[in-house]
């Protein structure tokens, strides 16, 4: 899967997971637009009669009556928009992925800020990074600083893929509380390894997403054909 196609999948995922709830009308607004009725014999205004005793006009209450809609103001909106319907296969495929892949894609491309996604991403990535470290002994303070970097690496890769500003080494050194020299000697190589973990996660998750979507669409098509037979 080349870079151009990966970007296409990202764009489809952004649209598929966008919050389009504001595009629909509320219940009261819809009711107001469709509340005009033609009652035929009965007038819209309540009838008024003269009270022979007091000489005053009295407004009578009409009983409930059935009616037919005369016209509708505005336009009706479907329960599911065309965009939501056409991108449903992408959402279905995302939800079928493994937890860390699903968490990464939703956090990266749907702007989901759910704490569970962030925890899943960092725990998985830290496990992968520890595997890369192997059995090498690392000082306790260094290990704690590396744990802080794993989440910063996730944010950095997300920003990089979106074309936004990424961290400078001097900025990272300040964030973890080390000198520029210490950063260069101890953390630069490991930082690059962390970012590679997330970049690989992104490409593999997107690839699996397209394969899962294709399989699901093929399965649904076969089911529909079987029903017709």
From Swiss-Prot:
The gene is Q. GO terms for molecular function: DNA binding. Belongs to the phage antitermination Q type 1 family. Positively regulates expression of the phage late gene operons. Bacterial host RNA polymerase modified by antitermination proteins transcribes through termination sites that otherwise prevent expression of the regulated genes. It comes from Enterobacteria phage 82. InterPro entries: Phage_82_GpQ. This is Antitermination protein Q. Keywords: DNA-binding, Transcription, Transcription regulation, Transcription termination. It holds the Pfam family Phage_antiter_Q. Residues 14-32 bind DNA. It comes from the Viruses. One of its GO terms (biological process) is DNA-templated transcription termination.
